[in-house]
Amino acid sequence: MLDIGVIGRLKFATAFMAMSLLLVPAAEAQEQPVWHYGLSLVDDLKYPPGFKKFDYVNPEAPKGGDLRLSQTGTFDTFNPLLVKGETAVGLDFVFDTLMKPSEDEISTAYGLLAEGVSFPDDISSATFRLRQEAKWADGKPVTPEDVVFSFDKAKELNPLYQSYYRHVVKAEKTGDRDVTFHFDDKNNHELPHILGQIRIVPKHWWEGTGPDGKPRDISRTTLEPVMGSGPYRIASFAPGGTIRYERRPDYWGVALNVNVGQNNFDSITYSFFGDRDVEFEAFRSGNTDYWRENQAMRWATAFDFPAVKDGRVKREEIPNPFRATAVMQAMVPNMRRKPFDDERVRQALNYALDFEELNRTIFYNQYQRVNSFFFATELASSGLPEGKELKNLNEVKDLVPPEVFTTPYSNPVGGTPQKARENLRKAIELLNKAGFELNGNRMVNTETGKPFSFEIMLSSPSFERVALPYAQNLKRIGIEARVRTVDPSQYTNRKRAFDYDVTWEVWGQSLSPGNEQADYWGSAAATRQGSRNYAGISDPGVDALIERVIFAKDRETLVAATKALDRVLLAHNYVIPLYYKLAAQIAYWDALARPKELPKYGLGFPEVWWSKSAACHLPAGVRCSCICGSSGEAGRHQFTPDRRLIRNAQLLDQICAASEFKG
């Protein structure tokens, strides 16, 4: 499954699909299509037909209040389908998809725009039936024509979608509310699933004219607020600075079981920052409400400000590994450029990274070294291959490195001066074999005499704390590594064009990998600009194993094929694995509230959270930092949007007395 924000987190397959007959009696099942209200890859559906809500939501969550969030970077388009430009964060609030995931089941989703999906036994096609009540924000119905238009334009305009949906060859209207997708291969178990992820856009709106009287063009970027069928609309924005989404009171799907207890904030505003440190200051100052931390030093040292001490800011570390898993974070050499096409060079670069020293000196020993492209999941390879994994590898034996059968992958271990010296000596040995030698204090090519130097391209100064010590280690073996942080637009454009020597990347994985693996590691993606094959991997063995992942017929087969793929990717030393923490580190002002139990496979943010000011029915402009009715002065603090505490006890008593909410 493709784990990127703009697409979602769904996955389907038939081998384990637990399904319900929606429209046909059992006697007619042989002749009529079987319509399924939900699909699951891993197990039976948790929720029965006609279920009322997801277990992890609060059906009584109050509606109201404002949520203020932050984002690093910028934006210059609201077009949800293009790869061009910097697409605005938050568009998932505007556009519905055919299916909606359940966050307490693995790779499971239920109908949103679609009331059901059907497909033949050989999975040569899939048909989605739209809900009759599904409407656009202008009141017009969502139609099969909209779905076909959305799919066709997504594949036409975005290389990522071209790869992801490459086995879907045609979409067509096949009924008043039905749209059928045709596949070029049979028994691809994930295709019905990933089709549920497409953002559906209104054909009539995009083929109409804009406020300037000119025809709209979906192939171009635009800052005209786009129309969708989702629970929010774009209410206002400042280009590159802020976006405010406003909840639609006329949203067609508000009462659907997959939406109960969700979409609770009246508005969601994103403020954009060019620097993560400045972004944190906005949170600390009370100008944004929620923070997810990704820097060990800040988590360990920066949360000592007054609002944390007096309880107005809550700080939580949520250890459930399924909320932070299957991640490969790495420095990525670009194999399209020499000498990074030499595996010995890439392996030498890994020996120069002293993770243990970094973990001790700047990470407060909070992190683990990543040692798998499917880190900390059942999909990760370990030890020597056996069983079905070994069978997969034997069947492509001539295409994979022989060491996958004899030597488990392991990262170099440092942490002491002696180990660091040993690792650097090993790096020099590998570089010598690759045609380099030390000439004085410089590593040079033995044939050309050219010094080995390269640029490490970063997107944020916060990564320099790792890259600069790494560059110093490389300098000890004569390599000049220049660390350069570029602005977000330049970073995005250079990544899309593969214009870098070494960069920093995080690949998120689902627990049900599939078509997206070809975009990450497949040969065709290596030359397709806009793909996520940042390393430039082009290897027939990897391609063969990707196909086995995609066409796995059941969970056991999928796990075995993925382990084999992981093992081969590691054996080629394509990347320099970095680190990760198997916990979610979050902080939030206590104007926010959430269900006591978060979903098993996510944080449910912001969908299932709500505003205490809505719960307390406070006057406009007043934000609630307590549960009304709690005892003690500290429990009765209220504050205004600029975080000035209201300490007038009489006023607080009046507010809480008028409130219908008693905590």
Curated annotation (Swiss-Prot):
Keywords: Periplasm, Plasmid, Signal, Transport. It is found in: Periplasm. GO terms for molecular function: peptide transmembrane transporter activity. It holds the Pfam family SBP_bac_5. The keyword Transport applies. The keyword Signal applies. Residues 1-29 form the signal peptide. One of its GO terms (cellular component) is outer membrane-bounded periplasmic space. GO terms for biological process: microcin transport; peptide transport. It comes from the Bacteria. Gene3D superfamilies: Dipeptide-binding Protein, Domain 3, Periplasmic binding protein-like II. Possible binding-protein with either a transport or enzymatic activity. Belongs to the bacterial solute-binding protein 5 family. This is Uncharacterized protein y4wM. It comes from Sinorhizobium fredii (strain NBRC 101917 / NGR234).
